Design a protein with these regions (language model features):
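Short, solvent-exposed amphipathic alpha-helices that sit
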Residues: 3-18, 98-102, 126-146, 160, ...
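Short beta-strand->loop
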Residues: 24, 92-93, 117-127, 152-155
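Hydrophobic alpha-helical segments within soluble ligand-binding/sensing domains
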Residues: 34, 90-116, 130, 160-162, ...
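Hinge/cleft segment of the Venus flytrap/periplasmic-binding protein
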Residues: 127, 138-140, 145, 230-281
Length: 281
């Protein structure tokens, strides 16, 4: 879970009197540890699972086991490719809308003409593939003078993504802008721009919840935010209904928000990013 997601889930759990055990790997890309956490929870007879999976495909068998065992399960942020049903629900970000926001923003800052690179396209996460497809569809239809000259697959760590971005920004014939489709690729691209003194020269649009100061200072043009607090709140609300034998909506889709220097201090952004923590001892 993201911190915002945890906060939203904790608030609803407090209101509903649910006891929550929060567990996560020490590294964001530690797939085997996350799988192990879920397997152990099932072995111990947990009453429900809320999961933000590192990847989609490796979790299908484990989540099917949970469903077959009658354990209510809510998946947050990633579509596993298993249809929602009585014991399985999804709370997702509208990734197509995120790609559209990125496309229109890059078109605006480039004046409708230029070259861009897309980094962070992961074959393991459908979210980044959807963002990339939506981004390129909008550019092709509405901004034909903006050309995608480089596409790079996503890597799991920030240092790896930084190395990818450094290959792009170190070129003399570098692109006008980079669109980074994940948190790791956004951070890696930003660090590469700092390292090669290309801040401002190459525009960066990313997907990240925490890089606020670089947006405020102009180091990053903009980031697309997911409403992680609301995702956590909705996920725990669905879990509560499932545990009480009700039939909640099987899938919820939440809209992203484009964060720029112009709206970073707005009430809408503050509401999305402010964490209200409740601890049920």
């Amino acid at each position: 879970m993201w911190e915002g997601e945890h906060a939203g889930a904790a608030l609803v759990a407090h209101e509903k009197g649910l006891r929550v055990y929060y567990q996560a790997p020490t590294r964001e890309d530690d797939l085997s540890s996350q799988l192990g956490i879920i397997e152990r929870a099932l072995d111990r007879g947990c009453n429900g699972i809320i999961l933000s999976p590192v990847e989609a495909l490796p979790f299908r068998t484990t989540i099917r086991r949970a469903i077959d065992s009658g354990v209510p399960t809510v998946i947050v942020g990633t579509d596993l490719g298993i249809p929602p049903g009585k014991k399985l629900a999804y709370v997702l970000n509208n990734e197509e809308a995120g790609g559209e926001l990125a496309a229109r923003r890059v078109a605006r800052i480039l004046g409708g003409k230029g070259t861009i690179a897309i980094v962070g396209i992961s074959s393991q996460l459908t979210s980044t593939a959807t963002r990339a497809r939506s981004l390129e569809t909008v550019l092709a239809k509405e901004f034909p003078d903006i050309h995608v000259t480089d596409r790079r697959l996503g890597l799991p760590t920030v240092p790896q993504e930084q190395q990818v971005a450094e290959e792009l920004v170190s070129k003399d014939d570098h692109v006008n802008a980079i669109v980074a489709l994940s948190e790791a690729s956004t951070r890696g691209a930003y660090y590469a721009l700092v390292e090669f003194n290309r801040i401002g020269e190459i525009k960066l649009i990313g997907f990240d919840q925490d890089l606020l100061e670089p947006v405020r200072s102009g180091g990053i043009d903009s980031v697309i935010l997911q409403n992680t607090y609301e995702m956590g709140r909705r996920a725990m609300g669905i879990m509560d209904e499932q545990l009480r034998g009700k039939s909640p909506a099987p899938q919820v889709s939440l809209e992203p928000l484009l964060l720029t220097r112009d709206n970073i201090d707005s009430s809408q952004v503050r509401q999305m990013l402010t964490l209200v923590w409740w601890y049920d001892q």
